[in-house]
Amino acid sequence: MKETFGEYIHKLRTEGALTLTKLAAALDIDQSTLSKIENGKRNIPEEILPKLANIFNLDIDQLEKEYFSEKIAEMIYPKENSSEFLKLAEQKAEYKKLTNLKQGKIDFKNA
């Protein structure tokens, strides 16, 4: 997706013929908040993603990828070497996965 997450929500809402009021009510947020999200003036709270996926019959994993990739992009786009930031972040994420995996195998009962 090359659009912002808010633009994506707007597209889903209009293609689904939902009004701001109806979608906001379904997400349990007020209409002005949803409008700000769609216009990029406010970020959508992460806890709303499962509701959004359910309403539009979307894969939650893909929706989370879009959501978090935008958050990362917002943090690094002003930097000149954004691709280097991404590479380093990916390496750190892999390290954290491996570290957590190793820690998960420790048998604390017999330690």
Predicted regions and their residues:
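A short, Lys/Arg-rich alpha-helix, primarily the initiator
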Residues: 1-15
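Residues within the helices of the helix-turn-helix
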Residues: 10, 21, 50
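The alpha-helix within a helix-turn-helix
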Residues: 13, 24, 53
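Short alpha-helical DNA-recognition segment
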Residues: 17-35
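DNA major-groove recognition helix of helix-turn-helix/homeodomain DNA-binding modules
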Residues: 28, 45-62
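Short, charged recognition helix plus adjacent turn
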Residues: 64-107
